[in-house]
Amino acid sequence: MAETIRIIGIDPGLRRTGWGVIDFSGNRLQFVAAGTLTSDARCDLASRLCQLYKGLTDILHQFMPQEAAVEHVFVNKDATATLKLGQARAIALLAPAQANLPVFEYAPNKVKKSVIGVGHGDKEQIHMMVKVLLPRAEFDSSDAADALALALCHSTHRIGASYHARIMA
């Protein structure tokens, strides 16, 4: 019988950070939980980052994942927005790393290709395939659905990723 691995996917954002937890065993996938963390826009940046960090650490303690998958940041024309996203992403990398989880990063196109078969699909296609692959999945936002897609992507790439990590060590 295959070992069950619990994976958390994290879709970082300063306003909304999606998270999704799945169990993966052999070729079996099971939805565990998903949700969205929000930070209070009335607070300063440091306080908002603390809110996200506390929320993520609480989720990590509650669901006890063994591996984490985080979306790789993209750069857009708005430098300020890109910087804020990068800071939220740092929290998404830090929280599981401090919990001693291996953290893997995936570009949005790789996630889409893993979940829907093409690298340039839209949000609706991703949400539909998340529901197909995880029929019991419930998510409160597109950020949570994207986080589940990250966890699914990692479940398909984890053997190669862990092998690559051992080679690089």
From Swiss-Prot:
Keyword Lyase attached: no
Signal peptide: none
Residues that, per the record, bind Mg(2+) 1: 11, 143
Cellular compartments annotated: Cytoplasm
Enzyme class: hydrolase
Keyword DNA repair tagged: yes
UniProt GO MF annotations: crossover junction DNA endonuclease activity; DNA binding; magnesium ion binding
Binding-site positions, Mg(2+) 2: 71
Substrates-to-products reaction catalysed: Endonucleolytic cleavage at a junction such as a reciprocal single-stranded crossover between two homologous DNA duplexes (Holliday junction)
Catalytic residues (positions): 11, 71, 143
Protein name listed in UniProt: Crossover junction endodeoxyribonuclease RuvC
Species, as recorded: Bartonella henselae (strain ATCC 49882 / DSM 28221 / CCUG 30454 / Houston 1) (Rochalimaea henselae)
Protein encoded by which gene: ruvC
